[in-house]
Each structure stands twice: as C-alpha cells, then as structure tokens.
Amino acid sequence: MIAKWSLGLIAVLVGVLLVYAFAVPRPFDTTDPTIFLQDGRSVNYCELPELDGSGRTAEEIPKAYTPGCSYTKIPMPILADCTEPLAEGVVDMRGLWLGVSGRVGHLERIEQCGNRVVVTAYGIIHDFRVDGTLENGARDVGAICNNFSTAIHFDDEGVMVFRLFDLFDTVFREMRGTEMIFTFIDGIETRTQRICSYPE
C-alpha cells in the first residue's frame, strides 16, 4: 500500500514538473533589445567595469531573458553600465571563463554588480539575484526549450549554489585562486581560466 502511494506521489510530481516545463507561459520579456544589436565577441572581457557606484545600479537595468529557446548571436554584456559594488558575501567571479579540465572547452561569461549575476553560456542567459529565492532566481529555458526555475545563493564558503526549484543543489561555482571551478550535478568538476575574448 505504501509503495502504491509512493508511486502515485512520484507520478503526480512528475506530471506537475512536466506541465511547468512545457505548458506554463514564460515571464514577460524585459530584455533590453539593444544587447543584440552588436556582437558580444567584440568586447575585451579582461577590462571589467569599475564597481565604484558612479553609474547605474542593478535595479535600474532590466532583467534579461533568453530569446526563444536560445540566442544565435552572443549578446553584449547586460550589466555593462552597472557600477553598484558587490553586495556583502558575494564573491567576484566576473569574466569570460574557458574550461581547461573536466568539461574542456566549457565557455561562460559571468557579469556581476550588487547582488545580481548574469551567466551567459550555451545559448542561454541566466539573469538572477543571489538572494536564495525563486522569485529573484533564474527563470530560464533548458536544453530542450523547457521552463525551469532556480534559487541561487552564496554559501558560507563563497560557493555560488544553484538549487533547482529550491529543492536540490544542481550547479556550483567557486573561485580557487585565479581559476573559477564549475561543478555540475553529475559531480564533474571543470577548472576554468579567464580569457579576454571569445575563441574563433
């Protein structure tokens, strides 16, 4: 009897997740369309914005979303004009990162200001706050154009933790010296090193 109830509960949970993944409408798109007018490959990502509070705040810049199921042209940096200093407890991971071990060739761009982070990789824009809430977390599309929602926070050791639906940890990012370490749910640890421009 318990096994029957357990299977029923699992079936309901899977059904709810499938409805959320493929039937629930995406949020209203607030992306600034100008980020797609130029090629993000043209930027020197070793020249990071000075977070001295002289420019715009994270709140003043519209949240960006992935267009459709994936972008086809690398967008310009979303937080380029933001100079809000990083919030307390937020580790500076800004830059363009290339995997040199684990998932060799893994490539992602990280932007930060205040408690806001934008990770751009594999055709997806993840724009979120690191406050540990689903409301301000990453509301994105996945590899098969599915909806998903993630709460993100920095733990006490400075690791950025992605919690899918705020239920379980799926992705981890942390700094070790000058390298950014990316670890996926499968346990594969990828060492990434900073590069200044997108590879050809």
Where are these regions (language model features)?
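Amphipathic/hydrophobic helical signal segments and adjacent flexible N-terminal regions
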Residues: 3-105, 198-200
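Short beta-strand segments that buttress and anchor functional surface loops
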Residues: 97-99, 118-121, 160-165, 182-185
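Solvent-exposed loop/turn segments connecting transmembrane beta-strands
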Residues: 103-106, 164-168, 188
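N-terminal glycine/threonine-rich, aromatic-flanked beta-hairpin/loop signature
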Residues: 103-147
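Aromatic-rich beta-strand edge motifs centered on tyrosine
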Residues: 111-112, 172-177, 194-197
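Acidic, glycine-rich flexible loop segments
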Residues: 146-177
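Short, exposed beta-strand-loop hairpins at the edges of beta-sheets
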Residues: 172, 180-187
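C-terminal, beta-strand-rich globular interaction domains
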Residues: 183, 190-197
